[in-house]
Every structure is written in structure tokens, then in C-alpha cells.
Amino acid sequence: MNKNDSQTGRVRIGVAGAGKMGNVHIRILSELDGLFDLVGVYDPIPERAEIAEKYRAKAFHDFDAMLREVDAIVLPCPTSLHKEMALRAADKDVHVLVEKPIAETLADATAMYDAFEKKGLKFTVNYVERFNPVVRTISDLAPGLDMVSVEVHRCSPFDSRIYDVDVVTDLMIHDIDVVVNSIFKAEPEKVKAIGRYVYGSKFADYAQALLEFAGGAAAFITASRCTEDKIRDIQIHAKGAYLEGDMLRRTLVVKRGVTYEDDANPKINYTQSNLTQQIVLQDKNPLKEELENFGKAILHNEELLNSREQVMRTMSVLDRVEYALYGRRG
């Protein structure tokens, strides 16, 4: 940690962007007061920055002024601003957690990581589902599964506040990250995608992606912001096993095929049934877990659970899905 609140041993942190996601970060950071000292909130719209007063923090109307008073920042601002604002933070020796996606291009993402690593600063991206207990448990179980296919659905009603990105960057990116980093831990060999424009002609509001991996296993990912329900589910089909998870309700069921030989009756070679196991998961807030990981990485040099390799893998596959949809980056 380059700069430190030496009196309290906490990370002095600010939030740059007080929109929908920014408000969530602000609230949770205020709850983690044993780890973070929420110094302030910056937003170019002055009235939005005033949310800081609710948490006894300072409203900043100048980003660089906030950088001078903090050890770290969270950047829940538009993707187009990520590179510029992150590099300004790195220049002031400030650690950064940035919202997904990391940047508009792979080249920008590389430049951002290089800048922070050169200065020995912590830098990570908010792929919050990686901290979901359903995903963490599936990640632990995945190496022992003879995988056939994975199906993931992330569906929501239309939100008029999301106007600058398509459904792949807005929603599907979370499940791309889960599939390539928590389940297969590899980049797919082939990527295909289809999409539908529902609420406008600029961005797809519904998309399906097919990721084909070495060995023949596949992942089917559906993302929708035109579904009149909120769905966050995952199904895994494997040889002798089936897993069904709900990332919203944080439940996971594992069903395994069980074969019994009947020694008493040689005419019956076996009977077959399913063993169903309801996995007991810890009820933890994934974003709180992620922010704790960020804070402990700064204070105690603990490993960031979203690594550079993983973030770049997700970004690469995101680009491939966008290209399959549009013939270009979306």
C-alpha cells in the first residue's frame, strides 16, 4: 500500500461515479467500515455527488482533488472513461477497482494493467459473479466433472437507464467470465452468436452465444433485457451428473446417477436411480466479498481473485462474441 491511513489501518477510498452501480458500491463500502474509510464521492453532476453526505463522506466536484485524499477508488463510470480515469489514478499512486468491462479495447486494457503493475498498485475489475457462492462451488466441482454442456441464462426487464451498451456488454459479460474462468478455465476454440434488436436499432437487447471448447464441451449463454422476469440460472450437464444453480437466490442442486448391482437376483443386472444433493451455501453478498478482497489485497497484499489473465480472457471472448454478432466490436 503506497498511501495509508496510518492511524486506523484502513483503506481511504473514494467512488468516482454516483449512478445506479455507484450507489451500490457506496452503500457497501460504508458497511465495511472496519476495512475502508469512505472518504468521498465524485460525480460530474453535482447533485449526484451529494449522496456522500448520507454516509458522512465528502462530495467532490473535482476528480483530481479526490485522488489527492484517497488510497484507492472504485470506478463505476461509463466504459468510455475507464482508461482515462484509471490512468489518472495510477499517476497519483491510487489503487483501482473498475466496473466491467475493463475498457473499450484489448489494447486499452493492456495499457491499464501495465501502468498499475509498473507502479506496484492493485488493479482489478468488478466481475462480481465470480464471488457468488453458487459460482464458487461450481468452480470447485468443475474439475471433477466430465463436462458435456453448460447453459446460462441472465434475463431482465428493459431498463431505460442502460442506453450506451448492448446486452452482451451489459449482461452477458458476467456469464462469459463465469464460463471461461470459473468452469472451463480456458478460452473457447469457436464462438458463434445471434441477437435481436428490441428497443432500438443501435444495440442488441437479446443475444445467445455458443462457445465450443477443446474436447467437444460447449456453453450456451443467453442474455436478455426484454424478459419480464429476472433470471440468473445455470445448468451443467456432465457424464453421470447434472447441476442446477440459481445465482439470484443462491441455491445449487447436484444430481448424480447411481447404479446398484442386485446380487440376490442374477436376472436383474442393476437398478438405477438419481442421488440428489442440495448444496448448503453460505449466504454472503458477492459484491461485499469482492470489495473485501480488494481491500485486503491493498492492506495485506492478498491475492486478487480476479487476475489479469482472467480479465483479459473474458475481454477477448467478449470481443469474439461481439464480432460474431455485428462483424465488429459492439
Regions found by a protein language model. Give the residues of each.
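Beta-loop-alpha module in the N-terminal Rossmann-like domain of NAD(P)-dependent dehydrogenases
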Residues: 25, 55-113
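N-terminal Rossmann-like dinucleotide-binding module
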Residues: 1-55
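NAD(P)-dinucleotide binding in Rossmann-like oxidoreductases
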Residues: 217-290, 307
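Rossmann-like dinucleotide-binding domain that binds NAD(P)(H)
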Residues: 159-229, 233-235
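C-terminal helix-rich "cap/oligomerization" subdomain common to oxidoreductases
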Residues: 1-10, 72-75, 214, 293-330
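A contiguous active-site-proximal alpha/beta segment in oxidoreductase catalytic domains
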Residues: 103-162
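Hydrophobic residues in well-ordered beta-strands that form the structural core
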Residues: 61, 98, 123-125, 245
